[in-house]
Amino acid sequence: MVSLSDYLILSSVIFCIGLVGIFVNRTNIITLLMCVELILVAVNTNFVAFSHFLGNEVGQIFVFFILTVAAAEVAIGLAILTLLFRNRGSISVDVTNSLKG
């Protein structure tokens, strides 16, 4: 039987992979978005694990809201990146630092 600590260890590993990915690769925006999504998956895993082991469905319902916000975040982020690539020809972080508002 899988225990709560197994889920927490898995979630911690996924969270750390996301953090390391953000700190190591700061040049590609798509990779940064993927690492943020890994962090959100780790948080969702914690919510589902605690919800299951405590016998409460609130954590699982909260995961649906997080997934909805994450999907909207990715859609808007990719739309911005598409426009940035069309206008600048690159999606590097260095290009976004030169944007004027």
UniProtKB/Swiss-Prot annotation:
Offer a single GO CC term for the protein: plasma membrane
Its domain of life reads Bacteria
**Which keywords, in A-to-Z order, does the entry hold?**
Cell inner membrane, Cell membrane, Membrane, NAD, Quinone, Translocase, Transmembrane, Transmembrane helix, Transport, Ubiquinone
Asked if Secreted is a keyword of the record, the answer is no
Q: Where in the cell is it found?
A: Cell inner membrane
Write down the top EC class of this protein. Answer: translocase
Per the record, membrane topology reads: Multi-pass membrane protein
Gene Ontology terms for molecular function: NADH:ubiquinone reductase (non-electrogenic) activity; quinone binding
Q: Transmembrane ranges?
A: 4-24, 29-49, 61-81
Biological processes, Gene Ontology terms? ATP synthesis coupled electron transport
What reaction does this catalyse?
a quinone + NADH + 5 H(+)(in) = a quinol + NAD(+) + 4 H(+)(out)
Enzyme Commission number(s) from the entry: 7.1.1.-
Q: Name one Pfam family in it.
A: Oxidored_q2
Query: Subunit structure of this entry?
Result: NDH-1 is composed of 14 different subunits. Subunits NuoA, H, J, K, L, M, N constitute the membrane sector of the complex.
Tell me which family the UniProt entry assigns to this protein. Answer: Belongs to the complex I subunit 4L family.
Role of this protein: NDH-1 shuttles electrons from NADH, via FMN and iron-sulfur (Fe-S) centers, to quinones in the respiratory chain. The immediate electron acceptor for the enzyme in this species is believed to be ubiquinone. Couples the redox reaction to proton translocation (for every two electrons transferred, four hydrogen ions are translocated across the cytoplasmic membrane), and thus conserves the redox energy in a proton gradient.
Write down what this protein is called.
NADH-quinone oxidoreductase subunit K
